[in-house]
Amino acid sequence: VIPAKRRKIPIFHMEAGNRCFDFRVPEEINRRIVDHVSDINMPYSSIARGYLLAEGFPADRIIKTGSPMYEVLHYYMPKIKASDVLARLKLEEEKYFVVSAHREENIDSERNFNGLIETLKMLDEEYGLPVIFSTHPRTRKKIEEKAIKLSESIRLMKPFGFIDYVHLQMHAKATLS
């Protein structure tokens, strides 16, 4: 965004104003920089708009757009419904969990990572259902480095594509992210 701004190219920032208020999260720093150099900020929610206003952005540089996810899901819903991912993974509707965890603050923090692993083990013990754990490379590396042994019902899977992942979420007992 900075090279574009230096070339006087107008910057319109979708997802503007999103905040987690944790500067250890790289995305938080990026969000704030991009918001501040953008000509127009387009937050999805009134909450995000409020954060921008509280930071001193003029109201005429903020256009609340709403989330595009409704349109995206509506457009892809026929393909999502047609996904055969449950059959490929031998899963039954409402009889499995979906888990995704890859954020730096959850994987690189020993406390948070250990809490995640304990949660997976408790989920397995309490429900006895398959846990489809979409493991990003940093997550898989950490599990391997620590030589963590998980039950066979906790399946470490490569990240799924959008269509299959939404289908999994729609039919899971619950999604943990």
Which residues does each PLM region occupy?
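Donor-nucleotide binding loops and adjacent catalytic segments primarily
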Residues: 81-173
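A nucleotide-sugar donor-handling region in carbohydrate enzymes
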Residues: 34-112
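Active-site and donor-binding regions of nucleotide-sugar-utilizing enzymes
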Residues: 1-58
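Short hydrophobic/aromatic-enriched beta-strand-loop microsegments
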Residues: 10-15, 60-66, 152-158
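Short, charged, surface-exposed secondary-structure boundary motifs
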Residues: 21-26, 73-74, 164-168
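A donor-sugar binding/catalytic signature common to diverse glycosyltransferases
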Residues: 1, 14, 41, 165-177
